[in-house]
Amino acid sequence: MTVRVICDFDGTISERDMIVSIMRHFAPEASEPIIQAVRAGERSVKDGVEAMFALIPSNQYGAVAAYAQAATAVRRGFPQFIHTCEQLGWKVAIVSGGFDFFVEPVIHNLSTASVDIYCNRIDASGSHLRVMWSKPCDEACDGGCGLCKPRVIREIAQPGDRVIAIGDGVTDVKAAKMADFVFARSDLLRLARELGLPHLPFETFDDITAAILDKGSELYAHLS
């Protein structure tokens, strides 16, 4: 049995949702209604993110990347969390609806451990930015994910594996439903409670590491 940890990036590893931060910096007025529609479930993540990046001219891509890399603040305890998982032989995958230009530099700078990264990229060859999804929804998903976290879980988890999901928002709900256990904050915490998913709340990765190291924690009742 392998324990597989599926960890979100925006608002989970990063203190802020970087896509929202980018939009409020580069296209604040036009993007805000889209942000709110996605959060309210009135617009799919895929459709909303594509529409938001299409607001930004391609000649601003360099500035967008530089802003995102400079503005990304990492939630406390993340490097120690990765180290703890590595020591236990747990496999960590960063599965993000975000983009390579800010996800990959942060992860590579913080950890030398073997961490798989699933994220997306931007095509700046046209007049405006275009989203290129690395893992679009498969036939088993009902669609609209953008990067499909359930697809990633189906591809990497083997029969008998245990899956832990870590996240903060509505984009993490489908993965949380597939997981054996969830570490949740913000909107995902509310939804985990409403759905009755086995979970623990967290604010920092120190909280998660403490639960992992406590063999008597609720987590282990769902990993046996």
Provide a role label for each language-model segment.
Residues 30-36, 61-65, 112-114:
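Short, surface-exposed acidic
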Residues 47-80, 88-90:
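Metal-dependent phosphoesterase signature
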Residues 77-83, 87-91, 98-224:
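C-terminal cap/substrate-recognition subdomain and adjoining C-terminal extension
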Residues 6-8, 95, 166:
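Short hydrophobic segments within beta-strands
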